[in-house]
């Protein structure tokens, strides 16, 4: 088999890239290791209105669980501060599949239960993918491979672009979807508590009036096996009990890369996108907004390369130039703050924030909560 573009991974980044390429007339194949797209869910499901607008997606009631108008910062003292934020909380299992359907309607093909094993190389150039399907091992050739295969990215690693993750490069996360009756359906909340949540924070993202995603993320250097879920249980039973009382109907645990993007997200015949490229905010762990926008850019650059018959690294570098223009400042600022946090006395930081008379105005002008949402 041979295609113009092979996309490995049917998450939002890969699906948007495939959609863009197929829409422009490219022959596209999506390889997805799961039997069902969109499960298990991997995040708090928040997305900014700006991200959807940038990739040309109109909000659809079929996959929007809540429309957000405000962001709230909660401190251990009980103080809360809020700013206006425009965005949505999604039903990821519906949204992710919706994106793949759009790609298929544009002409892309999809193969499920296709486990990518490695990038196929010819004198250092990526020329396809080896994968294991239901009926054995196969090779598929491509003019461009878009690696959207997640945090460990076998394709990126075998292409020599993705280094091994260290423990402090990962934020370990645990999240419940809770059914209850104490949620403000128009506001998400970030709870900052360095004593209970070292190197991280907790969140509450409403999914309507009686459901919410309640989770916690802890930087890997501060974590240990099972700590994220244990911490979440303690928060739900303790300081957050008045806000998140209810019954869990789903639990998810996982990891998010918080080391910042890999040095090169392109090579001869290959582009990296989403978690595979580690295009995740190093401070907040937010990556859904960047996945959509970088996925769209990757698809567009793949089309340009095929039209120009030039899939060299020097041509594909324009992909990195474009997504860095969009996110460079945000990522650099986030990385600097994340690197500075371990050197701070976080108890003093909390005390300082609690004492600031005009903290809401400071949050509004600094854009901190918007950046958490923007991810």
Curated annotation (Swiss-Prot):
Name the cofactor(s) required for activity, per the record: FAD
Q: What else is known?
A: Reduction reaction proceeds via syn addition of hydrogen for double bonds.
- Co-factor binding details: Binds 1 FAD per subunit.
What Pfam families does this protein's entry cite?
FAD_binding_3
As recorded in UniProt, its EC number(s) are 1.3.-.-
The UniProt catalytic activity note for this protein reads: a 2,3-bis-O-phytanyl-sn-glycerol 1-phospholipid + 8 A = a 2,3-bis-O-(geranylgeranyl)-sn-glycerol 1-phospholipid + 8 AH2; 2,3-bis-O-(phytanyl)-sn-glycerol 1-phosphate + 8 A = 2,3-bis-O-(geranylgeranyl)-sn-glycerol 1-phosphate + 8 AH2; CDP-2,3-bis-O-(geranylgeranyl)-sn-glycerol + 8 AH2 = CDP-2,3-bis-O-(phytanyl)-sn-glycerol + 8 A; archaetidylserine + 8 AH2 = 2,3-bis-O-phytanyl-sn-glycero-3-phospho-L-serine + 8 A
Provide the function of this protein: Is involved in the reduction of 2,3-digeranylgeranylglycerophospholipids (unsaturated archaeols) into 2,3-diphytanylglycerophospholipids (saturated archaeols) in the biosynthesis of archaeal membrane lipids. Catalyzes the formation of archaetidic acid (2,3-di-O-phytanyl-sn-glyceryl phosphate) from 2,3-di-O-geranylgeranylglyceryl phosphate (DGGGP) via the hydrogenation of each double bond of the isoprenoid chains.
Organism this protein belongs to: Methanopyrus kandleri (strain AV19 / DSM 6324 / JCM 9639 / NBRC 100938)
Pathway field: Membrane lipid metabolism; glycerophospholipid metabolism
Positions annotated to bind FAD: 13, 32, 43-44, 46, 92, 116, 275, 287-288
Q: Return the protein name.
A: Digeranylgeranylglycerophospholipid reductase 1
Would the keyword Lipid metabolism turn up in this protein's UniProt record? yes
What are its GO cellular component terms?
membrane
Q: Which UniProt keywords apply?
A: FAD, Flavoprotein, Lipid biosynthesis, Lipid metabolism, Oxidoreductase, Phospholipid biosynthesis, Phospholipid metabolism
Family, according to the entry, reads as follows:
Belongs to the geranylgeranyl reductase family. DGGGPL reductase subfamily.
Q: What lineage is this protein's organism placed in?
A: Archaea, Methanobacteriati, Methanobacteriota, Methanomada group, Methanopyri
């Amino acid at each position: 088999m041979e295609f113009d573009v092979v996309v490995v991974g049917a998450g939002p980044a890969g699906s948007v890239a495939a959609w863009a390429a197929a829409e422009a007339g490219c022959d596209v194949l999506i390889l997805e290791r799961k039997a069902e797209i969109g499960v298990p869910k991997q995040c708090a499901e928040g997305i900014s209105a700006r991200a959807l607008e940038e990739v040309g997606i109109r909000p659809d009631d079929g996959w929007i669980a809540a429309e957000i108008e405000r962001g709230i910062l909660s401190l251990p003292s009980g103080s809360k501060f809020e700013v206006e934020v425009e965005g949505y909380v999604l039903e990821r299992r519906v949204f992710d599949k919706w994106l793949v359907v759009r790609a298929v309607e544009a002409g892309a093909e999809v193969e499920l239960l296709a486990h990518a094993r490695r990038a196929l190389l010819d004198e250092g150039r990526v020329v396809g993918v080896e994968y294991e399907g239901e009926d054995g091992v196969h090779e598929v050739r491509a003019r461009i491979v878009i690696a959207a295969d997640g945090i460990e990215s076998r394709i990126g690693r075998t292409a020599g672009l993705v280094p091994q993750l260290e423990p402090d490069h990962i934020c370990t996360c645990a999240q419940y979807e809770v059914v209850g009756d104490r949620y403000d359906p128009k506001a998400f909340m970030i709870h900052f508590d360095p004593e209970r949540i070292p190197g991280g924070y907790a969140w509450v993202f409403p999914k309507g009036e009686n459901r919410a995603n309640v989770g916690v993320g802890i930087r890997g250097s501060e974590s240990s096996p099972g700590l994220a879920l244990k911490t979440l249980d303690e928060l739900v039973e303790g300081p957050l009990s008045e806000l998140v009382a209810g019954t869990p109907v789903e639990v998810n645990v996982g990891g998010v890369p918080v080391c910042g993007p890999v040095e090169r997200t392109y090579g001869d015949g290959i582009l990296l996108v989403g978690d595979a490229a580690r295009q995740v905010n190093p401070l907040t762990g937010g990556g859904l907004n960047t996945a959509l926008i970088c996925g769209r850019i990757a698809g567009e650059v793949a089309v340009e390369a095929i039209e120009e018959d030039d899939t060299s690294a020097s041509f594909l570098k324009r992909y990195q130039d474009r997504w860095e223009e969009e996110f460079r400042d945000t990522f650099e600022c986030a990385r600097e703050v994340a690197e500075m946090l371990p050197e701070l006395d976080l108890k003093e930081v909390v005390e300082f924030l609690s004492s600031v008379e005009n903290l809401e105005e400071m949050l509004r002008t600094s854009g901190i909560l918007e950046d958490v949402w923007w991810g």
